[in-house]
């Protein structure tokens, strides 16, 4: 391949976790990934295929047959904060990770997620492995801890629903192993296994299944997905602001009601010159004090709408953005990894051939020429393997591009959740406002235009005159 291919808890629990995060000094994630033994290109075909394979229709194995509903139904994983601080000297943040599919509930630390992701990248370097959120930041607060929990939940759900990852032993270990040494178990599962290229029976024939215009197709797909990412990033930002405004509106309504109650509860005596209006002022204070209940209810409804849109709209947008970002990261790995290595190997081979021609022309010693010939043969084998990996990387990229398109209907789910939230929120708020109107009418319904306290019927919201 030449040229450009593709672009790349409750509040108490959160608060306790924020304190723990400030002192967290977890063990550094081990980077000693197991290194598979080198295998000649001719022997690759004889590798025993891994038991887990992408679901493929009869015919071209490059094409996938999945629906969004099938992917979403594979598993739903919950990630919740555990506020307890463990360790004699070091304090950590722990998460309870629960899987519907495996009917399991295990405790995991952030570094367990790191090793889990490392094993996925080790075994599946040509697939969309989602990124992890940052480990920590100085003075980590409740918002950071909660944002990281949400990001870890999105990460593990994307992995659990991936057609290939979902059938791998690494995922099962992470979601169901209840021992204390889960990191070692994850590493052991990858020892001497090698990556997907060494285990896939189609790896050496990947080129045969790729379309002739693969470069043009991927250039178009890359541009499309880049545009989709940029648009969804803006949608997410707007959705965040809409949800945030609903929560801010709730806070303002609550304060508004409290101030009305404060006015109604004021006991400061009236001056003598205002004694004639004392009854009017007293009635008005009673009325204002009674209205605070409705404003508290309005605040509650607005807060519910904001939280619902955070969970059902913003989080779904973040999930899709995480998926798109993993695709961009995959493209970058392809260009900076296998493609770059292939090009360097070709350049090195070209230099060797020149040296060989020069040695032959200068009649160098036979031993020197034989050594150079041996190195050239080794380089040819390396180039052959890299070329096979390059085509297999393109093969996987093509399938991952298909998965992105399978997830595109998630847009309709997000829009439906947003519209339903707006309808429900406005409907509930409208009902409370309408219930409030009769009470305002009561303020002006007294005899001789004297203000009377608002009536607060418990059920029907009607105010008898």
Swiss-Prot record:
Q: What gene does the UniProt entry assign to this protein?
A: SNX8
Q: Does the keyword Transport apply?
A: yes
- Any GO BP annotation: intracellular protein transport
Q: Which residues carry this modification: Phosphoserine?
A: 456
Q: Which residues bind a 1,2-diacyl-sn-glycero-3-phospho-(1D-myo-inositol-3-phosphate)?
A: 109, 135, 148
Q: Which residues form the PX domain?
A: 73-181
Q: Which family does it belong to?
A: Belongs to the sorting nexin family.
* Keywords assigned by UniProt, alphabetized: Endosome, Lipid-binding, Membrane, Phosphoprotein, Protein transport, Transport
Q: What does this protein do?
A: May be involved in several stages of intracellular trafficking. May play a role in intracellular protein transport from early endosomes to the trans-Golgi network.
Against SMART domains, the record matches this protein to: PX
- InterPro entries in alphabetical order: AH/BAR_dom_sf, PX_dom, PX_dom_sf, SNX8/Mvp1, SNX8/Mvp1_PX, Snx8_BAR_dom
Q: Where in the cell is it found?
A: Early endosome membrane
This protein is called Sorting nexin-8
MF term (GO), any: identical protein binding
Look up and give the membrane topology term.
Peripheral membrane protein
The record's listing under SUPFAM superfamilies reads:
PX domain (SSF64268)
For the region Disordered, give the residue spans: 1-36
User: Which Gene Ontology cellular-component terms appear in the entry?
Assistant: cytosol; early endosome membrane; intracellular membrane-bounded organelle
Annotated positions of the Phosphothreonine modification = 452
